[in-house]
């Protein structure tokens, strides 16, 4: 995400989706606040992890629906091992 002066906004970590047909996902890193309006480190980490889990879940769902689409950021998958019994 770009700020008004055209530079990258450091509040976002951007994960590129498909070049032509997919979304670009943004994960805010600094929005968790405590009751008194200040951010504690633990709250920020918890909030970040919740958004990361949601982002990964959304990406996997989107990816499974768009198998033919080329994706810049591939999620590594374990190789399937055939069991020999």
Swiss-Prot record:
Recorded source organism is: Gallid herpesvirus 2 (strain Chicken/Md5/ATCC VR-987)
This chain's protein is named Uncharacterized gene 6a protein
């Amino acid at each position: 995400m770009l700020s008004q002066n055209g530079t990258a906004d450091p509040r976002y970590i951007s994960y590129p989706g498909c070049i032509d047909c997919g979304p670009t996902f943004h994960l805010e890193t600094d929005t968790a606040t405590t009751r008194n309006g200040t951010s504690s480190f633990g709250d920020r980490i918890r909030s970040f992890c919740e958004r990361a889990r949601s982002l990964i879940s959304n990406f996997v769902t989107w990816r499974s629906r768009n198998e033919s689409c080329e994706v810049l950021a591939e999620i590594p998958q374990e190789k399937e091992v055939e069991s020999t019994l």
